[in-house]
């Protein structure tokens, strides 16, 4: 599935000195082109389809629970005084049940869920745990700290003379056509990734490597979950790949049902605000290129009336949202790093029998999407688990 407006944006980016590329995984990701995606026969592909179903389904030693939530991990004191993770307490939807581990426990609840579970289990900043009446198993100040995310700044441009999803899905007939094409052919807008066209470039020429990533979409809306706009438009979503802002994930009570306090602290540093303003200027430069001229792009958000760095940084915060790449809250690190929760094999320092395998282990956010790096980390961890338990 290709869109004229996306092809024109790619050509405009090339005219603005962002080179064309057909492969973002060739070593240098700088350039503009169509993303490689996790998709097969019109369906999104995932780890369950690629790993669990062909390998684990039907095995007598594999059991998968859905609709369940870990309330806490269980620890026992060993004869030498160390603490070992021996299982988990799980809410299965009707009652709490205890699951015991004979070798080790692998926690993979993500960069938000894993620190929450660790803190509820007594592994985390001691003052936070005591505040909520939780016994301290391990004082680990790094648990829940160092939260990083890619903040996408969603610039919207009204256009004319090109089909967009806004127009195609604006009527019941249009929606029916889209649905019918997907049912019959597994193609069309319902088969596409949220963003098809991407680009990696620099916010300013003095940058050593690309520090911006674009996700360009043939649609627009006020916020995720809201209706599409009634006018034809595209969204040029740009994020700072290397943010310096750091946030946190901290429990608000000792109840597993209560969501933690998530403080991403977006745009909290001068550097991040500077890059935000620069990134919107890069977007404007691309939109002004000849390749897009015939579609008469009109900046709708943030609006051409905003020109100063201060205004652009402020407006960036108003039109931005997470791109769902939280990392870093259980980071791996060196032995002499007091904030390192995990060692180089993803084992939790200070206790035995427990690993964390998810994006929270990344000490610094990747310069691109986090999905594939997390899968690669999981594959490495699988090998380490086998080696360490021989």
Could you describe each region identified by the protein language model?
Residues 1-85, 154-179:
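Conserved redox-cofactor binding core of oxidoreductases
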Residues 1-28, 33-35, 160-163, 177-373, ...:
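FAD-dependent oxidoreductase catalytic-site/capping-region signature
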Residues 5, 9, 47-51, 113, ...:
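Stable alpha-helical elements in mature extracytoplasmic
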Residues 47, 64-67, 72, 85, ...:
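Soluble FAD-dependent oxygen oxidases
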Residues 50, 68, 103-104, 330, ...:
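Structural detector for helix-capping/boundary residues
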Residues 72-179, 188:
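Glycine-rich loop(s) and the adjacent beta-strand/alpha-helix scaffold that form part
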């Amino acid at each position: 599935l290709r869109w004229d407006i996306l092809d024109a944006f790619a050509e405009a980016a090339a005219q603005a000195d962002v080179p064309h590329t057909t492969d973002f995984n060739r070593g240098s990701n700088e350039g503009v082109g169509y993303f490689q995606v996790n998709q097969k026969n019109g369906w999104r592909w995932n780890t369950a389809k690629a790993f669990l179903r062909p390998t684990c389904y039907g095995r007598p030693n594999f059991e998968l629970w859905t609709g369940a939530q870990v309330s806490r991990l269980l620890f026992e004191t060993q004869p030498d005084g160390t603490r070992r993770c021996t299982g988990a307490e799980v809410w299965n939807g009707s009652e709490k049940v205890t699951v015991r581990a004979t070798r080790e426990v692998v926690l993979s609840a993500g960069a938000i869920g894993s620190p929450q579970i660790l803190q509820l289990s007594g592994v985390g900043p001691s003052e936070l745990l005591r505040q909520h009446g939780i016994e301290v198993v391990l004082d680990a100040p790094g648990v829940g700290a160092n939260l990083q995310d890619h903040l996408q700044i969603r610039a919207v441009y009204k256009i004319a003379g090109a089909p967009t999803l806004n127009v195609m899905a604006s009527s019941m007939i249009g929606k029916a056509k889209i649905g019918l094409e997907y049912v019959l052919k597994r193609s069309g807008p319902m088969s596409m990734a949220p963003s098809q066209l991407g680009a990696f470039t620099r916010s300013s020429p003095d940058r050593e490597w690309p520090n911006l990533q674009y996700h360009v979409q043939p649609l627009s809306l006020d916020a995720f979950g809201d209706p599409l706009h009634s006018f034809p438009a595209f969204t040029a979503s740009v994020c700072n790949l290397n943010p310096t802002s750091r946030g946190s994930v901290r429990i608000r009570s000792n109840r597993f049902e209560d969501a933690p306090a998530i403080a991403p602290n977006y745009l909290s540093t001068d550097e991040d605000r500077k890059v935000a303003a620069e990134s919107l200027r890069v977007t404007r430069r691309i939109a002004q290129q000849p390749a897009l001229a015939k579609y008469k792009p009109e900046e709708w958000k943030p609006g051409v009336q905003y020109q100063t760095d201060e205004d652009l940084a402020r407006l960036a915060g108003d039109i931005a949202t997470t791109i769902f790449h939280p990392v870093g809250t259980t980071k791996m690190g060196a032995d002499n790093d007091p904030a390192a929760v995990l060692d180089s094999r993803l084992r939790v320092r200070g206790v035995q029998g427990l690993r964390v395998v998810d994006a929270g282990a990344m000490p610094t956010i990747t310069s691109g999407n986090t999905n594939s790096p997390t899968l690669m980390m999981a594959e490495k961890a699988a090998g380490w688990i086998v080696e360490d338990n021989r």
